[in-house]
Amino acid sequence: MASEICKTISVARLEKHKNLFLNYRNLHHFPLELLKDEGLQHLERLYMKRNSLTTLPENLAQKLPNLVELYLHSNNIVVVPEAIGSLVKLQCLDLSDNALEIVCPEIGGLRALRHLRLANNQLQFLPPEVGDLKELQTLDISSNRLLALPERLHLCLSLQYLTVDRNRLCCVPRHLCQLPSLNELSMAGNHLASLPIDLGRSRELQYVYVDNNIQLKGLPSYLYNKVIGCNGCGIPIQLSEVRLLTFSSGQLTVFLPAEVKTIGTEKDHVLPLQELTMRSLYRTYHGLWKDLNFLSPISLPRSLLELLHCPLGHCHLCSEPMFTFVYPKIFPLRETPMAGLHQRRTSIGFVAYCCSTQCLRTFNLLC
């Protein structure tokens, strides 16, 4: 087997092959023949699926500098080494079905990367540097142990497909709603109890799958005209299990995002002072300075500064920004024309988040 592999690599070097297939070769170590002398300078695509590799060589980028695609599906790799960040031409990296516990920060150096697949590993977190991947279009991190997503993920401005199924997420960063190119978001099989108020506000986002998040009972009304998956949601549980603000209408009780501190009804015509102040500051920021540098952490707590950068959400009727206070309104799914599409599980509802009593009275999802 070893001699056969050496021969395959030698031929590839001699004939300057751009593609090299070393799948199913029972490799326990990265072939030294690949790293010999100057390496394979012409190689662009390396496929090493279903071997037994545990690591990657530190001089990988030096010996294979023109790699565009690296396919390492189904190995035993535990750590993505720092050297991976030097593969500046890499566009596709597949490390699905390995034993990954750590993705090094240097992955942010892969500025040409378009597709990153890390499904079925042991990851508990992603480095913030993932946000440096400006060309990234596809990110699959399903079937890991992630408790949260990095907020800097919203800086991946080219991201179109995000798959985070079967992790341990309890919340979704509201910053993800700022992704301008996101078309499909799948978060099935997590521990979500609420979704960001602005999720679905972007016209680009057309597909949202949140199946089997049993505590999730409310979907932002922006998702009403999208393709959604919500089977297995809204299973009755003890409210004490979730420490979030709740809102009830009829027999349906939904959890609200953690940033929501207070809710209003049609009788609450006056907004809390903090909410009024935040809205005024936001209008000033957008109308005059276009820059939050005029506010410092000394004059305003960091948590409120972050809300000014990225509001809690926007009114589902008039798009007024909201920060800590909302007027919610529930439309049970079973009472909408979509009920027939979700016969197995209809004990959830669409939640409209409004900025005032006037918008609350006016908003009608079904008109």
Curated annotation (Swiss-Prot):
* InterPro entries linked: Leu-rich_rpt, Leu-rich_rpt_typical-subtyp, LRR_dom_sf, LRR_domain-containing, LRR_R13L4/SHOC2-like
Keyword annotations from UniProtKB, A to Z = Leucine-rich repeat, Repeat
Mind telling me which SUPFAM superfamilies this protein's record contains?
A: L domain-like
Q: Does this UniProt record's set of keywords contain Plastid?
A: no
The residues bearing each LRR repeat, given as ranges, are 16-36, 42-63, 66-87, 89-111, 112-133, 135-156, 158-180, 181-202, 204-226
Domain of life, per lineage: Eukaryota
Entries under Pfam families matching the protein: LRR_14, LRR_8
| Keyword hit for Repeat | yes
PANTHER family documented for this protein: LEUCINE-RICH REPEAT-CONTAINING PROTEIN 28, PTHR48051
Name of the protein described by the UniProt record: Leucine-rich repeat-containing protein 28
Q: Which source organism?
A: Mus musculus
The major lineage groups are: Eukaryota, Metazoa, Chordata, Craniata, Vertebrata
Q: What's the gene?
A: Lrrc28
